[in-house]
Amino acid sequence: MIDIQLLRKDIETVAARLAGRKFQLDVNTFNALEAERKQIQSGTEELQNRRNTLSKQIGALKGKGEDTSAVMAEVAGIGDELKASAARLDVLQAEISKFMLAIPNLPHESVPVGKDEEDNVELRKVGTPRAFDFEVRDHVDIGAALGLDFDVAAKITGSRFSVMKGGIARLHRALAQFMLDTHTEEHGYTECYTPYIVNADSLQGTGQLPKFEADLFAVKKGGQEGEGEALYLIPTAEVPLTNIVRDEILAADALPVRMTAHSPCFRSEAGSYGRDTRGMIRQHQFDKVEMVQVVHPEKSYEALDEMCGHAENILKKLGLPYRVITLCTGDMGFGASKTYDLEVWLPAQNTYREISSVSNCEAFQARRMQARFRNAQGKPELTHTLNGSGLAVGRTLVAVLENYQQADGSVIIPEVLHPYMGGLTRLLPQA
């Protein structure tokens, strides 16, 4: 969450910056909560001072052998008032915390102001889309003859799932292995294996809760009627990776922390009804290789550009045309201060589609998680956190199928993946 001191010092400026994100800050509610908090805290201090004064009087009266009952009765009454004030203050603090958790991150000054994706700014294009001398097919038609099956998945589970068999399943696995190897061997990340089920504290730490619970899949021990705390399937490995440093104080020389993980991701896709209903572009379950960095605050924007380059390197090695865009204020994710999207060329759609999103969250997540490091003065200071897809495996598979398709229905496997394919250099349609 953002620093509450910013609201206390200049709430109107904060409200104006958030308006660029299409978020209306309820200034009146915050001011009312703060006014009552100050009033109670001031009253509490007065009561405590009065109690201290009376306690001294009791001592003096006892020393003189005089009656202390009236003064002691007043002290007892003050104790009751203090308990009531403390209880009300706890309620207020909870309301203020709830208020703060609902506020998105402040956009960095370099982020273009805009309403939606139409106002995003293209930074660069890399690679030239291939010219085909035959009718281009989409990944659904190509994949149907290669072992990609949505009907069986619908029978097993429902819509927005897929089954892969044979060579295409191996290609999917090869992509994930290639991404992990590149990030660990070339980019300096530590590979991690993390839980695919997390608790509410973890999701609150990275910003999915409480605001976006409808986007999640909830699970319980013992089935739907089971007992115990609410647990959730991860929407991205960003959640468990980033929460590794929750409630930790790192040594300054331990920064940056670079972590990567391959995991399935589970999303309800609330609000996306009717969008991308065909194929693998938008599914309830998909694989992704995630990158996370925990860095010194002064180096987070350097790290953002670095991470964008790491994601780009995967696309370059695969020979896939892509572009990089800077998201405008109105199109950024809840926790991001600045985001670059990488979009890969999909011939069948004749357009670029998102395949990676790389974001600097500054101290937004760290403040929620209390992820800190010891600064040069030895004092705990909030880290900055960054995350990015490196890449979405399913969408990368889609891009490979469409960009490397052949007229006979086969798909040439990018050379960089050959070591992972057991000698296969081309996927052939199954009889």
Swiss-Prot record:
One of its GO terms (biological process) is selenocysteine biosynthetic process. Keywords: Aminoacyl-tRNA synthetase, ATP-binding, Cytoplasm, Ligase, Nucleotide-binding, Protein biosynthesis. It catalyses: tRNA(Ser) + L-serine + ATP = L-seryl-tRNA(Ser) + AMP + diphosphate + H(+); tRNA(Sec) + L-serine + ATP = L-seryl-tRNA(Sec) + AMP + diphosphate + H(+). Its main location: cytoplasm. SUPFAM superfamilies: Class II aaRS and biotin synthetases (SSF55681), tRNA-binding arm (SSF46589). Pathway: Aminoacyl-tRNA biosynthesis; selenocysteinyl-tRNA(Sec) biosynthesis; L-seryl-tRNA(Sec) from L-serine and tRNA(Sec): step 1/1. The keyword Nucleotide-binding applies. GO terms for cellular component: cytoplasm. InterPro entries: aa-tRNA-synt_IIb (IPR002314), aa-tRNA-synth_II (IPR006195), aa-tRNA-synth_II/BPL/LPL (IPR045864), Ser-tRNA-ligase_type_1 (IPR002317), Ser-tRNA-synth_1_N (IPR015866), SerRS_1_N_sf (IPR042103), SerRS_core (IPR033729), tRNA-bd_arm (IPR010978). Coiled coil: none annotated. It is found in: Cytoplasm. The keyword Nucleotide-binding applies. Its EC number is 6.1.1.11. ATP binds at residues 267-269, 354-357. Homodimer. The tRNA molecule binds across the dimer. HAMAP family: Ser_tRNA_synth_type1 (MF_00176). Consists of two distinct domains, a catalytic core and a N-terminal extension that is involved in tRNA binding. Catalyzes the attachment of serine to tRNA(Ser). Is also able to aminoacylate tRNA(Sec) with serine, to form the misacylated tRNA L-seryl-tRNA(Sec), which will be further converted into selenocysteinyl-tRNA(Sec). PANTHER family: SERINE--TRNA LIGASE, SERYL-TRNA SYNTHETASE. Belongs to the class-II aminoacyl-tRNA synthetase family. Type-1 seryl-tRNA synthetase subfamily. This is Serine--tRNA ligase.
